[in-house]
Regions:
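Hydrophobic h-region of N-terminal signal peptides that target proteins for export
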Residues: 13-22
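Bacterial N-terminal signal peptides that target proteins for export
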Residues: 1-10
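Boundary/junction segments of secreted and surface-exposed precursor proteins
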Residues: 21-51, 245-246
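A short beta-strand element within beta-rich, extracytoplasmic domains
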Residues: 71-90
Length: 246
């Protein structure tokens, strides 16, 4: 693990509303940071991106409601930041074959997925929607002086029952396409994250801890960004929409 622009095995420091189920409401708001963005903010920079392409994926967790309540999660939204100084995709499908959402308690299972096509932001699953957050007003992500677009992924129609007040894990990632002229290497998926106190926006449930999973979704412990390539803790940005049931 480390902060290395060229390592294949590294953790990289790395809005529009879709249609939701009737009665669905925002219950977790840990959205994109609104303050202290990019290198212009110096040591107070809040935004970062992370990936873990050693042999699995990076995730995080959240809780919905209060203990004793029952909820059904309708939709989960996250963001990704692909590209670097050498290659910047026009579409998310240029870099990735698919996108997947894993969800669960200790270990995670896939609950939604969609195929992607080069030259397009359309997906093979109407319940998975991709949009460019930077077109909707999000600030471009500064990666070592290269400005990168931020892509929003909405997984809808999930129908996931959860217990109120209990933390559940999630992970979003995509299978990378082969990198031209880089034999055996594929594009790594980068999750948008931020430091909660510096974000200037609601960061529900942020605890400065992310989660590691192998490719099958089995838990491999926790990850703290501080001291592992960054100078402060971070959480993956996520928004959750759900409805309460009796």
């Amino acid at each position: 693990m480390g902060w290395n622009r060229t390592s294949q095995f590294a953790l990289w420091v790395t809005m529009t509303l879709p249609a939701f189920a009737a009665g669905s409401a925002p219950v977790v708001d840990r959205g994109l940071p609104q303050a202290n963005l990019n290198n212009a903010s110096g040591p107070a920079r809040s935004n970062v991106r992370w990936d873990w392409n050693e042999h699995g994926f990076l995730g995080d967790d959240f809780a919905v409601g209060a203990a004793g309540e029952r909820w059904v999660i309708d939709s989960i939204r996250t963001w990704t930041v692909p590209g670097n100084a050498d290659r910047v995709p026009e579409h998310l499908g240029d870099f990735y074959q698919d996108v997947r959402l894993h969800f669960g308690e200790s270990d995670l299972t896939p609950v939604s997925a969609a195929q992607l096509s080069p030259g397009s932001d359309e997906t093979g699953n109407a319940a998975v929607r991709i949009s460019e957050a930077t077109q909707a007003g999000a600030i471009l992500y500064d990666d070592f002086g290269t400005s990168l677009r931020i892509w929003q992924i909405d997984f809808t129609g999930l129908n996931l029952p959860v217990e109120g007040g209990k933390r559940y894990g999630f992970g979003v990632w995509g299978m990378g396409r082969a990198i031209p002229e880089a034999e055996g290497k594929t594009y790594a998926w980068s999750n948008h994250a931020s430091n909660a106190p510096l974000s200037g926006s609601r960061q529900d449930g942020a605890d400065g801890r992310m989660l590691l999973f192998d490719a099958a979704g089995r838990s491999e412990g926790t990850f703290n960004a501080e001291g592992q390539g960054w100078d402060k803790p971070a959480d993956i940005n996520v928004q959750v929409f759900a409805h309460r049931v009796e």
